[in-house]
């Protein structure tokens, strides 16, 4: 397994990882696995506009709704982004909802923490 983040003690090895791969190594054990191609078709449509970024992201954008499936190529995960939603929480779950709240055992709703929100809006790419 590659060393995550700091390379102290590994000065003679080229094992530092960063960005999406770093986040995936830290957090992906709590992420749901999902089919990237099905999500692209569902949210970005059959003919999405595809762009890539300098940071290793491939973006599939619906030309009408502007909703994007953002694939982190190195991290092997994706998120679903809706630019029409204002504020910080503009990523969607697999049902197309902003998962701001969770339902407790007693049936009441409670707001999610940032960590919980990130956990339910990151999806490991099903291979």
Show the residue positions of the predicted features.
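Low-complexity, glycine/serine/proline-rich disordered segments
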Residues: 1-59, 73, 77-127
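Charged, amphipathic alpha-helical segments
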Residues: 59-69
């Amino acid at each position: 397994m590659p060393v995550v983040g700091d390379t102290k003690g590994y000065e003679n090895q080229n094992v530092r990882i960063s960005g999406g791969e770093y986040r995936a190594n830290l957090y992906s054990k709590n992420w749901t696995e999902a089919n990237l191609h099905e999500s692209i078709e569902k949210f970005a449509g059959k003919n999405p506009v595809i762009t890539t970024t300098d940071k290793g992201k491939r973006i599939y954008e619906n030309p009408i709704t502007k909703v994007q499936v953002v694939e982190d190529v190195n991290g092997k995960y994706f998120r679903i982004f809706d630019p029409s939603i204002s504020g910080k929480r503009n990523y969607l779950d697999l049902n197309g909802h902003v998962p701001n709240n969770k339902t407790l055992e007693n049936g009441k709703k409670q707001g999610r923490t940032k960590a919980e929100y990130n956990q339910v809006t990151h999806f490991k790419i099903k291979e």
